[in-house]
C-alpha cells in the first residue's frame, strides 16, 4: 500500500466529510429510496432512480475517502524548521520577470487546490521548490512556459479549506 503525506488540516477535512457521508448523507438517501419505492412501479419511478444514483455517488465517495485516509501519513509542518522548503511549507515567491508576488502551500495530492494556492507536492512547481532556501531562484516548466521565481519567504501557516 502506497502511503501519501497529508497535512493534519487535509486529514481533518476529509475525515469530517467521510463522517458526514456515513452518518448523515447515507441514511438520508436510504430514506429517499424507501419513500420513492412506496410510490410503486420502480421501472418508471424517476425519484427512485435519482435516489439510487445519489446513493451510488455517496458510496463511491465513501470508498474513495476511506482509501485516501487509510493511506495517509499525517505530517505536521509545525514540527519542521522552515529554512528550506518542505512538505507543508508556505512559500512566498517573486516572479523574476514580472515582480509579481505569489504564495503557495505544499500539500498532499487530495488536498491540492491550485486556485487557493494549495499545490500538490507532486506538481512541477512543488518539486522545483522542495529543498530550496530563501533567495534561491527556481526555474519551472509550466503549461504556460518556463517561469523563474525567487524564494522570498518560507514559513508555516494554518490552512483553511473553506
Curated annotation (Swiss-Prot):
Keywords associated with the record: Coiled coil, DNA-binding, Transcription, Transcription regulation
GO molecular function, one term: RNA polymerase binding
Coiled coil, from the record: 44-72
GO BP terms: DNA-templated transcription elongation; regulation of DNA-templated transcription elongation
Domain of life: Bacteria
Functional description taken from the UniProt entry: Necessary for efficient RNA polymerase transcription elongation past template-encoded arresting sites. The arresting sites in DNA have the property of trapping a certain fraction of elongating RNA polymerases that pass through, resulting in locked ternary complexes. Cleavage of the nascent transcript by cleavage factors such as GreA or GreB allows the resumption of elongation from the new 3'terminus. GreA releases sequences of 2 to 3 nucleotides.
Record family assignment: Belongs to the GreA/GreB family.
Protein name from the UniProt record: Transcription elongation factor GreA
Species this protein is from: Nautilia profundicola (strain ATCC BAA-1463 / DSM 18972 / AmH)
